[in-house]
A protein has these predicted regions:
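Structured soluble/peripheral alpha/beta segments that form catalytic or ligand/cofactor-binding pockets
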Residues: 1-174
Length: 174
């Protein structure tokens, strides 16, 4: 996986939206999805068309400060969702997702081995930003609806659209 990964299941009072994009540095999208699923079982899910993203990164990092997700071809007119992150979770640290050399998914450690690791958030931010990041987030639509859910992202390699010129650079100050 290279480029940007962005995934956001969001729950509102009468529907949920599932948004997902994998985009390469050159703008190619091997994967994209945007669908609204209604709470009312008599309503069919709605395809929202090609989703568009506008992320603002924290200068010097690969961390998303805020986002705007747009669905220009939504059935009822353009749908815009403002994403306000509430909490970062660096899921690639301490979970077996790949940043821990001594503990990976499926790695045999011996019979009945149990390990633990406790770190403060400020200790892992500097390297955790290079893995997968989940944010608890508030989502607000241009129709006034407020919901909550997950905003997940990762940037691997360059992603020049947001000022990431190589695999390790952070976003420039704006």
């Amino acid at each position: 996986l290279t480029g940007m990964w962005n995934y956001a299941p969001m729950q509102f009072s009468d529907h949920a939206i599932l948004y997902m994009v994998n985009e390469t540095d050159d703008g190619d999208r091997p994967l994209q999805e945007a669908v609204r699923i209604w709470v009312d079982p008599n309503r069919e899910p709605e395809a929202l068309g090609r989703p568009e993203h506008e992320h603002e990164l924290v200068p010097g990092t690969r961390l998303v400060r805020r986002s705007r997700l747009r669905f220009p071809r939504a059935p009822e007119g353009e749908l815009v969702v403002e994403v306000a992150p509430l909490l970062n979770a660096f899921v690639a640290v301490g979970t077996g997702y790949g940043m821990d050399p001594d503990w990976r998914h499926g790695m045999y450690q011996g019979p009945l081995v149990v390990q633990g690791l406790v770190r403060q958030l400020d200790e892992i931010t500097s390297f955790g930003q290079y893995g997968l990041i989940d944010q608890v987030a508030r989502f607000t639509t241009n129709f006034g609806q407020v919901g909550y859910g997950l905003h997940e992202f990762g940037f691997w390699g360059p992603f020049r659209r947001y000022g990431l010129v190589d695999a390790f650079s952070g976003a420039a100050a704006t």
